[in-house]
């Protein structure tokens, strides 16, 4: 069964995006699937603005545990975050920067509370490069300008969703995994959404939404 059939219970593409925006404004998470011919995987996404220790613990416990902070190009530049590697030859050109840790307010940096502190420190509009230690336990991702219209990735989808919801343009994501450690695909993502009261949408939905409403995002 393809994504469209599986997600029909969540409404049409526009409704799915609108429900995701409502959830984010309420401080809840959403589940974002990328294209079936790409990774065909789902990420749990939370806004940095509303992020709680409990939500971070859920990502560590129920997902891959590799929690990434999606930042705009401008914020990553402001923090002077260089690429993780000089030559990025990953299949999807995921723009990891060096990993980070808050210099103040954390212990080992690995606990849910410490990761939330690091994330909120880095996403603060007034943050400075010297507020962060490198390396650390949080993995920033640099979103391409233009969002999903430029690159159909979870990073860009996260930043677009925050902007569309009127929230601070920073979000966290973590890939959802199955209990046996394999990657969750669309059927498992739908089940996860029901279990945790999270709407499900796709990158394709977001592209359709932006095209329909002619949304120009940074």
Curated annotation (Swiss-Prot):
Catalytic activity line of the entry: D-ribulose 5-phosphate = (2S)-2-hydroxy-3-oxobutyl phosphate + formate + H(+)
A UniProt-annotated Pfam family: DHBP_synthase
GO function terms (MF aspect): 3,4-dihydroxy-2-butanone-4-phosphate synthase activity; magnesium ion binding; manganese ion binding
Pathway: Cofactor biosynthesis; riboflavin biosynthesis; 2-hydroxy-3-oxobutyl phosphate from D-ribulose 5-phosphate: step 1/1
Residues the record marks as site: Essential for catalytic activity: 137, 175
Family: Belongs to the DHBP synthase family.
Quaternary structure, from the entry: Homodimer.
Name this protein carries in UniProt: 3,4-dihydroxy-2-butanone 4-phosphate synthase
Gene source species: Vibrio parahaemolyticus serotype O3:K6 (strain RIMD 2210633)
């Amino acid at each position: 069964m393809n994504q469209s059939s599986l997600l029909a219970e969540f409404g049409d593409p526009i409704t799915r995006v609108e429900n995701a925006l409502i959830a984010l404004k309420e401080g809840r998470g959403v589940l974002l699937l990328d294209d079936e011919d790409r990774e065909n995987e789902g990420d749990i996404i939370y806004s940095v603005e509303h992020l709680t220790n409990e939500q971070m613990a859920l990502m560590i416990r129920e997902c891959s545990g590799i929690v990434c902070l999606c930042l705009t190009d401008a914020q990553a530049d402001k923090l002077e975050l260089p690429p993780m590697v000089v030559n990025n030859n990953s299949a999807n050109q995921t723009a990891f920067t060096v990993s980070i840790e808050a210099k103040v307010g954390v212990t080992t940096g690995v606990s849910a509370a410490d990761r939330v502190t690091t994330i909120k420190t880095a996403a603060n509009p007034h943050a400075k490069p010297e507020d962060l230690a490198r390396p650390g336990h949080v993995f920033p991702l640099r979103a391409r300008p233009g969002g999903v219209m430029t690159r159909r990735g979870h990073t860009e989808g996260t930043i677009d969703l925050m902007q569309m919801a009127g929230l601070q343009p920073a979000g966290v994501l973590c890939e959802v995994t199955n209990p046996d450690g394999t990657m969750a695909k669309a059927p498992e993502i739908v089940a996860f959404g029901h279990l945790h009261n999270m709407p499900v949408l796709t990158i394709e939905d977001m592209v359709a939404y932006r095209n329909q409403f002619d949304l120009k995002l940074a």
